C-alpha cells in the first residue's frame, strides 16, 4: 500500500529549472559517489534519536558548516531514528536529465550508491512522479497489486526493497533531488506518529541549502 503525502512542506510547485543551472552550490562535486557504511541501527529509543538529531542539526545551522557534512548528519538521524536498512540523498544532475545518489548510509550502500539513479521521463513510475509532481511516497509493500506496476525495473534490479520512502526536495519551485530510504520487511516505513520528524529533517536541508547560497 502506498501512502502518498502531498505536497511536501516547503516550496513544492514543480517546474523545470534551466539546464546547467547551479541549484545547490554548497554541495561539493564528486568524482565518485561518497558513502559511509554503518552496521545495523542501534537500540536507543528512536524518538530520542530523532529529537536529539534534529536539535543537533538546528544548532549546526546557526554556526559555520559544510553542506556535505550537514547532509550526512541528516542521513544519520534518519538512518538511526527510523531504523532504516539504507538511506540515500539523491541529487538532480546539472543538466536536469537524471537524478543520482550522492551520499548514503546503511547496508551495502557502497555497492548501491553508484547504481542508484534514474532518468527524468514522462513516466508513471513512483520516482518520476515524485520529482515531477512534488509528491512524497511511503510504500508499505512494493509488490502490492495497486503499486507493483509503478515500481520501475531499474529499482527492482538495484534494490527491490519491500518497503521504502521517496521524499523529493524542492526549493523555489525547482526539484534539487530526493531522500530515499528503505526497510527489509513489509509494513509502514515510518510510523504515523513520526512522519513530522521526516518533514522537519527535509526542511532543515532546505534551510541549509538556502543559507549556503547567501
Placement of each model-derived feature along the sequence:
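Metal-dependent nucleotide-binding catalytic modules
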Residues: 1-47
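Short regulatory/linker helices and ligand/cofactor-binding micro-motifs at input modules
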Residues: 37-41, 52-69, 77
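Regulatory loop-to-helix N-cap segments in sensory/regulatory domains
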Residues: 43-45, 183-201, 208-212
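Helix-loop-beta substructure at the N-terminus of cytosolic sensory domains
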Residues: 64-101
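GAF sensory/regulatory domain recognition
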Residues: 90-118, 122
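Regulatory sensory and allosteric helical modules in signal-transduction proteins
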Residues: 110-147
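Signal-transducing coupling segments at domain and membrane junctions
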Residues: 142-162
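A short, aliphatic-rich beta-strand micro-motif
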Residues: 162-170
